[in-house]
Design a protein with these regions (language model features):
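Glycine-rich beta-strand-centered segment in the early N-terminal region that forms part
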Residues: 25-43, 54-94, 120
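Conserved hydrophobic/aromatic beta-strand scaffold that supports enzyme active sites
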Residues: 19-21, 26, 70-72, 105-107, ...
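Cytochrome P450 core scaffold surrounding the K-helix E-X-X-R motif
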Residues: 46-51
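NAD(P)H dinucleotide-binding glycine-rich loop of Rossmann-like/cofactor-binding domains
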Residues: 90-150
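Short structural boundary motif marking the start of a folded domain
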Residues: 3-8, 34
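Conserved small/polar residues in nucleotide/adenosyl-binding loops
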Residues: 154-156
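Short gly/ser/thr-rich secondary-structure transition/capping motifs
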Residues: 15-21, 54-55
Length: 156
């Protein structure tokens, strides 16, 4: 891995809010024990709020948004993951408090990650997003004899 990579960085100085794709250094990623090469991310409603003006969800600037991402483990200090593991990250306030997935690389706590099911690709995982992944996890764990009701609410 090169020490420099691209990330969408938001910043707020006084009343001035900015978004910019920047070349940053690996040392910029200050949280976590697992480094992931991000393959895909999503644009969630919460991401849109954060990208507009921080939405009072982001407390420290500069910041990398992106609440969901899927990718491949590059480095790990955790016993839970090893180099080459394909992972999914959703929730845990990543993209709000912790740096998120709008970056070529992300560094997060191992507890925030799950191994990607082999039945789906990283792209498919991010096409589903947080709500879809929750539903699919339920479907994978439901017994064949059980009925599962999936509801969807779309706000336009």
């Amino acid at each position: 891995m090169s020490d420099n990579f691209n990330a969408l960085v938001i910043n707020q100085e006084g009343e001035k809010f900015s978004r910019e794709i920047k070349k940053i250094d690996k040392s910029f990623l200050k949280h976590g024990d697992v480094l992931v090469k991000v393959d895909y991310s999503t644009l969630n409603f919460k991401d849109a709020l954060i990208l507009k003006n921080g939405a009072r969800l982001v407390k420290e600037f500069p910041h990398i948004p992106g609440i969901d991402f899927a990718g491949t483990v590059v480095e790990s200090k955790s016993d839970k993951f090893k180099e080459g593991d394909e992972i999914i990250q959703t929730g845990w306030r990543v993209g709000e408090i912790f740096y998120g997935g709008y970056s070529q690389y992300a560094k997060v706590e191992a507890n925030f990650l799950v191994k990607k099911p082999k039945e789906i690709t990283s792209r498919q995982a991010m096409m589903l997003g947080t709500a879809g992944l929750t539903a699919i996890q339920c479907a994978f764990t439901a017994k064949q004899t059980r009925e599962v009701l999936l509801l969807s609410l779309i706000h336009i």
